[in-house]
């Protein structure tokens, strides 16, 4: 029982995902694996993930075996597993808006003819397509989403292009009878999840959150790409929503700054996050909190993607269509409906057991409940 997976964008995140599947291929059901909810996730284990095709536009990756491409060109994440030859050639995908100006300074675009993505997905009998395209790839990501619908495979949208959380696109997936888990992958323990937890802690302990910022620096191609500020709009919206949605009162946008800040080449795939929260406590006395988080960026989300892929396959098996609500809320920054993280995890556990499904009726109920609780809700 395998999950046939395709990858769009063979960068650092794809490298960590492929390495992770190799690294944990011999685990047992009772093993506690860092970064995964369960080794056995609804009947699917890590070793059940099988990479069958991949797409990229980098001349140094196209035509290579996936095992080689994950270490090629500008990829600079940490190596933690030796990946054998997979017999999976990286194919030339369509570019669209996938290459920003800084990307074009660093890589050579392949001169090979782009393939018909939907046809490849059909030919390879792909179950789940994972999109790892660069931030700002609006047209390119939506083209891959359309290809997934055309081919009848599930889609995991790891970047901040609003598809699962966009009403029009969510309906397209429902009409096509195809599930989507999205949008914008969370890390295992990253800047967004820690910021969310502490913002919620302030409110739970009666501290009014007045102002906050989150500044991120890193040395991978993602951070270089985001130097082009025109590609950042959806990223900033996604990260900001993820934090402010757990705060019950409206925050003045002037008092919230969350987003990537700069590129520091020598950090490689490490990310440093600097976060500050300013609040008001008893007696209108100020209370301030600052912290710094250091992570290897790509491995920090790879386990989450493994769980998201398995959730997408379960949804496919159950013939669900449109946004898969519980997994999207737990694994993604910008889902159709936000839940507090503990509640989202509980819903995923119920989803695994088949007690919660991604139905339109459930979506309506979740939205109504969230609005009644005063949450910032956006609905697909």
Stretches with model-predicted labels:
Residues 1-144, 150, 229-237, 273:
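N-terminal glycine-/serine-/threonine-rich beta1-alpha1-beta2 phosphate-ribose binding loop
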Residues 8, 47, 61, 72, ...:
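Active-site-lining helix/loop region of Rossmann-like oxidoreductase modules
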Residues 9-15, 133-139, 159-165, 186-192, ...:
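Gly/Ser/Thr-rich loops at beta-strand to alpha-helix junctions
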Residues 18-20, 64-67, 167-170, 194-195, ...:
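Short acidic, glycine/serine/threonine-rich loops at helix termini
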Residues 38, 273-380:
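C-terminal active-site/capping subdomain that shapes the small-molecule cofactor and substrate pocket
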Residues 129-131, 155-158, 181-184, 212:
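Short catalytic-loop micro-motif centered on adjacent basic/acidic residues
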Residues 134-150, 158-179:
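Rossmann-fold NAD(P)-binding glycine/threonine-rich loop
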Residues 172-185, 206, 210:
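Rossmann-fold dehydrogenase core element
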């Amino acid at each position: 029982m395998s999950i046939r997976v395709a990858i769009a964008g063979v960068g650092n995140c794809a490298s960590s995902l492929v390495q992770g599947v190799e690294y944990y291929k011999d685990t047992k059901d009772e093993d506690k694996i860092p970064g995964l909810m369960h080794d056995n996730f609804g009947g699917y284990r890590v070793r059940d993930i099988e990479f069958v095709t991949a797409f990229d536009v980098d001349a140094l990756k196209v035509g290579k075996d996936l095992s080689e491409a994950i270490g090629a060109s500008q990829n600079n994440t940490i190596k933690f597993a030796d990946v054998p030859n997979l017999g999976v050639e990286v194919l030339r995908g369509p570019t669209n808006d996938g290459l920003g100006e800084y990307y074009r300074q660093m890589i050579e675009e392949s001169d090979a003819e782009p393939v018909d993505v939907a046809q490849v997905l059909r030919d390879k009998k792909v179950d789940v397509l994972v999109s790892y395209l660069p931030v700002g790839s609006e047209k390119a990501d939506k083209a891959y989403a359309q290809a997934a619908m055309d081919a009848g495979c599930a889609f995991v949208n790891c970047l901040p292009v609003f598809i699962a959380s966009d009403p029009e696109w969510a309906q397209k997936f429902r009409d096509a009878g195809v599930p989507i888990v999205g949008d914008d992958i969370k890390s295992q323990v990253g800047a967004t999840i820690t910021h969310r937890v502490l913002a919620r802690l302030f409110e739970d302990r009666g501290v009014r959150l007045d102002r906050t910022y989150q500044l991120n620096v890193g040395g991978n191609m993602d951070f270089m790409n985001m130097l082009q500020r025109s590609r950042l709009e959806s990223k900033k919206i996604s990260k900001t929503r993820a934090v402010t949605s757990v705060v019950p009162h409206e925050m003045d946008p002037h008092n919230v700054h969350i987003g990537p800040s700069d590129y520091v080449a020598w950090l490689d795939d490490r990310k440093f996050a600097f976060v500050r929260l300013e609040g008001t406590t008893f007696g209108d006395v100020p209370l301030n909190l600052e912290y710094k988080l250091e992570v290897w960026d790509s491995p920090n989300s790879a386990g989450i993607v493994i769980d998201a892929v398995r959730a997408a396959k379960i949804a496919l098996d159950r013939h669900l269509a449109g946004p898969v609500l519980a997994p999207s809320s737990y694994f993604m920054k910008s889902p159709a409906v936000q839940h507090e993280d503990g509640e989202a995890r509980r819903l995923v556990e119920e989803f695994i057991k088949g007690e919660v499904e991604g139905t339109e009726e459930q979506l309506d109920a979740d939205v109504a409940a969230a609005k009644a609780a005063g949450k910032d809700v956006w609905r697909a």
